[in-house]
Amino acid sequence: MHTKTIVELYKGLKNKDFSCVELTQYYLSRINQSKLNAFITVTDELALVQAQVADDKIALGNASILTGIPYAHKDIFCTKGVKTSAGSKMLDTFIAPYDATVSQKLNQMNLVMLGKTNMDEFAMGSSNENSFYNAVKNPWNYLKIPGGSSGGSAASVAGGLSCFATGTDTGGSIRQPASLCGITGLKPTYGRISRYGIIAYASSFDQAGIMTKTSQDAAIVLNIMAGFDEKDSTSAEQKVPDYTTNLNNSLQGLIIGLPKEFFLSGLDNEVANNIMFAVKEFESMGAIVKEVSLPNSVYAIPTYYIIASCECSSNLSRLDGVRYGYRSKESKNLEDLYLSSRSEGFGEEVKRRIMIGTYALSTGYYDAYYLKAQKVRRLISNDFKKVFEKVDVIMGPVSPTTAFDLGSVKDPVSMYLADIYTLSVNLAGLPGMSIPVGFAQDLPVGLQLIGNYWSESKLLNIAHQFQLQTDWHLRIPQEC
């Protein structure tokens, strides 16, 4: 059953081939036997209660397509009464007193939450090695990273531990692990899904999204996650369409842009070949391919890491050992409490970004770093606007390589390069997807789809049509 999509599980539940309780027990058994370390918290008792409620709803004929579907929730979304750690020692004992808007919407649809997934601490990382709860393993090769920061969510879907999972994408944290684990990942337009109740890393970048087996599943889940929320000041009052309506539209005449900057040195040859084979598949469906340019995307890494680190420095200042979270037992006075609690509670990468952000915001450096980075951010956004006057969608790689070995990248700057193709999308606030398009070195390769603002329907349509013609999204890791 772990290979089934949302649509297939819905049919099975509707036909009474199995119950929600049986389905939930099946997934919980797989989680308990798994060696992926994909979960921080397994909510088995809660899941079985939710499954029984879903069974009762189905019996009364009041079920939707999502009723009783088991999912994994990234441990950055607040869940009332359930530990919400953000992968950090700082929040290891934090029990959220309220639900994030996304959590609330999923609960209202009578979905079954199997647990909270492992992640890079406060979503800062590209390998899921920065977690206080140890690294997640890639289901395709246990010696490889799953990607980050939503590595636990990606591994849970690829490894058959959940039907789908939630994620967040600040600089590629849905698309990159989706690519490295061979699943479908969607990061919507900034403001499309409420950020209320998501533990903040960089507020002008953070965006909730979805990790699924198929584009059709992603459309189904986006239907209930998207929408305006008065609790989130960055939430957009943009009408939410039915994202499943246009999935079967023809791609005849679709204009695809390939940014020349995405295919320079540094991109693995096998990865590039897989990307181009996928593009040729789209051409066979009637699409037209054009070379385009995003000249300022080469500045995406320094621009992102300056702005995001500044926002991180501000957001994480609330974690001081006083109100909630980790509190040092060795402190002698209030100042010492602040210093020791944060030094002991935060991991090395988080402390590095806090220091970078604090430095960039300090007197004498604000204009030289933060203000300049914001100006470059605008130039990057303008590049995309110009390109979208000529094309319908931009395509390219998600990651320059396939998944690398656990523990093999020690240099932070080298790690930051893993996000070279995804960061510009977050800087511009655009929607993006990753869909599986092949393998290199026996590891999955993802194709990145980048759309104009609010074009999630188009991206899902493009991905769905590709998945009707290919079977890369149906491939399953041998050990799973």
Swiss-Prot record:
Organism: Vesicomyosocius okutanii subsp. Calyptogena okutanii (strain HA)
Job description of the protein: Allows the formation of correctly charged Gln-tRNA(Gln) through the transamidation of misacylated Glu-tRNA(Gln) in organisms which lack glutaminyl-tRNA synthetase. The reaction takes place in the presence of glutamine and ATP through an activated gamma-phospho-Glu-tRNA(Gln).
Catalytic activity: L-glutamyl-tRNA(Gln) + L-glutamine + ATP + H2O = L-glutaminyl-tRNA(Gln) + L-glutamate + ADP + phosphate + H(+)
GO molecular function, one term: glutaminyl-tRNA synthase (glutamine-hydrolyzing) activity
Protein name: Glutamyl-tRNA(Gln) amidotransferase subunit A
Coiled-coil residues: none
List of catalytic residues: K74, S149, S173
Family: Belongs to the amidase family. GatA subfamily.
Oligomeric form and interacting partners: Heterotrimer of A, B and C subunits.
GO BP of this protein: translation
InterPro entries: Amidase, Amidase_CS, Amidase_dom, AS_sf, GatA
Known EC number: 6.3.5.7
GO annotations of cellular component type: glutamyl-tRNA(Gln) amidotransferase complex
